[in-house]
Amino acid sequence: PDRGVPFFFLRLDPAGNVSKRFSAAGFPFARYGGSCPRWVVHSAFATPGVMRVQVAQLPDGGTFLCFARSVSRMASSWAEPKPVHVIAMGCDIAHAGEVVYADGIDVTHAAVGIGLSCRLCDRANCRSRAFPPLEHRLALDPMTRGDSPYRFERTPGR
């Protein structure tokens, strides 16, 4: 029987700590370390209360409609900062037509390349990369400057 759109759900704090996550959509969350800085969940902190929408494409070609919004609660006292989190949800791009947040987006051309995390990502030209990938050897050349702070040689077969 048809049970509706399978979504994933994520809640994280400004430090990137994930406090809740569920996935019926097959989104492969990173188990350790931070997630990709190009993913919409991180930019949602910069626009409090505004729904941010992104078509995110993983290196393996998996593509997801993602939407995220920051939420805050009252502080427990005047001396405490307000707790802020981002709530993110998404679904496989095949279900985008069933989700209102895809309205007006050309999902076939709007994809932003993201990775699970910098250490697991094979995207060589990422300007947001914070760490080199674990599976590839660094290409150190003091005379060359690329898009990414970490140039690397692809490991054969990976």
Q: What is the predicted role of each segment?
A:
Residues P1-R158:
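Active-site hotspot residues in diverse enzymes, especially metal/ion-binding acidic/histidine motifs
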